[in-house]
Amino acid sequence: MKKLILLAMTILVLTSGGFTQPAAAESLRVGCECTYFPFNYRTNDGVLTGYDIDVAKGIIGIIGADVKFVCQKWDGMIPALLANKFDLIIASMSITEKRMQKIDFSIPYRISVGQFVGKKGANLDLFNKDGSPNPANFKGLKVGIERATTYENWISANVPSANILLYDTNEALYLDLQNGRTDVIMTNPMKAFLKFLSKDKGKNFGFVSPPLDDPKIFGVGVGVGIAKGREDLLKRINSALKSLIQDGSLEKYSLKYFPFAIHNEKWEGVE
């Protein structure tokens, strides 16, 4: 009789939910280009790495979720997020008012700037001593930029007489600059230094402008993109980012890839 009672109690516990399987770990899908050196790119062995990848792993590690990276072309990045192909954009995307009309962003994890690269000794005189552009010297100048970036907005707003040439990849910018198809290019200075100017192919080229950081165009910095309506996840991401800022992890990540750190003062006091 005791055995029957024990068996009945065991069945009751199992069927009433007393026995539960461990909860599956949360999984977050991260969209990035996978070709944007040194921020998110594949090594010769096919390993996805870069500053953005380290940031993504750092954030999601603090959150306690699993991460899956999804490669996506740049000009389709926001549409893919809105189509639920991934949960987050961690791909060096600048926070701008235009983009914030469609998606939400975390606090910045990197400053956002642009800089012109051209041939050494060309004496283009594109900028005045105070750092402002000289529109007259941009007239008819062939300026290469990557498609769907904020650099096109800067040129249109400041030197509209320039002849803009659009490219699908950053690598194509360097090639046409070398071949003389463009006079200058506008791009990210950190990436330009690492991938072009520090290489033999870029020895005859250099920066021909100061760093340009107009927040109205480039935004307040680079952030994590997320679909609107996911406020709880956004709060967790911001909390994780603040931890990475405070413990020096972001600076550590930058020094793995860049010849200089992204300055701490740019991160202090972000809310």
PLM region spans:
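Extended ligand-binding regions for polar small-molecule ligands
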Residues: D54-I62, G121-S132, L141-K142, T149, ...
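A ligand-binding cleft/hinge motif common to bilobed small-molecule-binding domains
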Residues: G76-P79, A91-Q101, S156-A157, D183-F218
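Periplasmic-binding protein-like
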Residues: I111-Q115, L197-N238, F260-E271
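Immediate post-signal peptide segment of exported/extracytoplasmic ligand-binding proteins
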Residues: T20-V47, G131-K142, E268-E271
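Short helix-initiation/N-cap motifs at beta->coil->alpha
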Residues: I53-D54, K68-P79, D130-G131, L165-N179
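A conserved helix-loop-strand patch within extracytoplasmic ligand-binding domains
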Residues: A65, S94, Q101, I107-N153
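Ligand-binding clefts/hinges and TM-proximal coupling segments of bilobed small-molecule sensing domains
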Residues: D66, G131, E146-V159, I164, ...
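Extracytoplasmic small-molecule ligand-binding "clamshell" domains
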Residues: A25-M93, Q101, D247, F260
